[in-house]
Amino acid sequence: MKSCEVNFDGLVGPTHNYGGLSYGNVASQSNSQQCANPREAALQGLAKMKALMDLGFTQGVLAPQERPDVAGLRQLGFIGSDEQVIEKAARQDMPLLVASCSASSMWVANAATVSPSADTADGRVHFTAANLNCKYHRSIEHPTTSRVLGAMFADAKHFAHHPALPPVAQFGDEGAANHTRFCQDYGQPGVEFFVFGRSAFDTRYPAPQKYPARQTLEASRAVARLHGLSEGGVVYAQQNPAVIDQGVFHNDVIAVGNGEVLFYHEDAFLNTEPMLNELRDKLGRVGGQLRAICVPRAEVSVQDAVRSYLFNSQLLSRPDGSMLLIVPQECQANASVWAYLQRLIADDSPVAQVKVFDLKQSMQNGGGPACLRLRVALKETELAAVNPGVIMTAPLYDTLTQWVDRHYRDRMSENDLADPRLLIQCRTALDELTQILKLGAVYPFQLN
């Protein structure tokens, strides 16, 4: 049976703004308080989705969250009508309103961890929504994420959904941004690669000193258990604490994997050689042969990797067996990174082509091509069971671009978030979106 890996990209929400909410994310912090353009952000994301669809890749779309999060503000003590809640929050605690308006759910690499059916004990595709416990503005996402994923992958014969892990620091889980799967073929058993920043309970593991390590070993192990993964099909690797302190807040900022290829920076991991040996051995047992591409620090510094988001790229398999690397424009603008990429495709490497995309609105908030997509490997029967409304087609692209043009503002500053009309505009847009994508009722305002 044929299998493919589908990229489900996050649709940027109507409240996209530069709130500077993500401590440890250099781009997010450095662009704080700038004026954002939600319409441009959403259209840039849709353009990438359509381009990959046009290249022959199966492409999906994942809906944004309801923002402002009025229910969350009520939980924190603001009372009155929805408009009064927003007005009071703006007057009394503007940073909290900014957090409650974040469009960070666009980075769906953090939405969940996904294990394909070939790896799981019960032969179903498993999803665990990420608790994103490290940051308030992201910790409020998982209830809606779970409902949206449930509406997209509804057939219990093929799909299993798990709620987020307990929302405490010991089980901090950032989803697929710290998870990669290696395999010889998407439909065959593979090796799932979980990267953690620290251990909550075992002091033998080092931890970063400046910025928080958002993913714990304990969370990664819990997800592997929930998904019914075998010990022989899992490798746990620790991210280098020194690079976390340089702004590498997720593993997908310093490494990317696909198929049998791991593309990573020399400083990405601790104990790199033993980890590679374990990965090579376990992948070999399921018929694969690891190809590790190490980018030397002498050619690309960690700082340049973070600035350009070289590793926050999409590594995609083409029908001829070669790979395509999707990178943001910032890679082309960085001399050392671009020179390295030219050497990479000229060498005898699996990467045959580099394709550049303008994702500036997302990049300025700290999210590149890989942040914007959730990968789901599916067999033909499983793909047929996915809600067809969320699979990108030329007509759906046209419908969504028109929807964005109708509902999105072209300017969003902190003051705009206090406008009570914004809530009405967002709910109107999302209500229409659930009909376009055939999701049913998934947002709090639709459920109440």
Swiss-Prot record:
MF terms (GO), sorted A to Z: N-succinylarginine dihydrolase activity
Q: Which residues form the active site?
A: E174, H250, C371
Top enzyme class, one word, equals hydrolase
Reaction catalysis annotation? N(2)-succinyl-L-arginine + 2 H2O + 2 H(+) = N(2)-succinyl-L-ornithine + 2 NH4(+) + CO2
Classify the source by domain of life: Bacteria
Under Enzyme Commission nomenclature, its number is 3.5.3.23
Q: Where does substrate bind?
A: 19-28, 110, 137-138, 214, 252, 365
Question: What keyword terms does UniProt attach to this protein?
Answer: Arginine metabolism, Hydrolase
Which PANTHER family does the entry mention? N-SUCCINYLARGININE DIHYDROLASE
The record's function comment reads: Catalyzes the hydrolysis of N(2)-succinylarginine into N(2)-succinylornithine, ammonia and CO(2).
The name of this protein is N-succinylarginine dihydrolase
Origin species, per record, is Pseudomonas savastanoi pv. phaseolicola (strain 1448A / Race 6)
